[in-house]
A protein has these predicted regions:
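Thiamine diphosphate
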Residues: 1-92, 97, 105-108, 114
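Short, intrinsically disordered, charge-balanced linker/junction segments flanking boundaries
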Residues: 113-119
Length: 119
């Protein structure tokens, strides 16, 4: 696993390790491996990255591993390079078996991410 790692303050009694990966597909594979090793794991991605993570989402959901994927849902890149909100990428993940929580503000994301880890 290649990436830059740093240590951060404690979250749920554990030190937080942050790893920045070079691609979303690699990040999803690292999330799967981290979950399989028993670590509390989350990742942050945008619409295009989520589509690259779908194969690993099937594996994570099939093994019932507790991951949290924070997704910034925006329109997929096109010739117009749209920056408007769109949920087509998230809807493409419905059949993976992952539970989805949808927030409408940054504050809700901050409030519900720990809740998602606890559930």
């Amino acid at each position: 696993m290649s990436g830059q790692q740093t240590e951060e303050p404690i979250f749920f009694g554990h030190e937080v390790q942050i790893t920045e990966m070079q691609s979303e597909a690699g990040a999803a594979g690292a999330v799967h491996g981290s979950l399989a090793a028993g670590a509390l794991t989350t990742t942050y991605t945008a619409s295009q990255g989520l589509l690259l993570m779908i194969p690993n989402l099937y594996k994570i959901a099939g093994e019932q591993l507790p991951a949290v994927f924070n997704v910034s849902a925006r329109a997929l890149a096109s010739h117009a390079l749209s920056i408007f909100g769109d949920h087509s990428d998230v809807m493409a993940c419905r059949q993976t078996g992952c539970a989805m929580l949808c927030e409408s503000s940054v504050q809700e994301v901050m409030d519900l991410t720990p809740v998602a880890h606890l559930s």
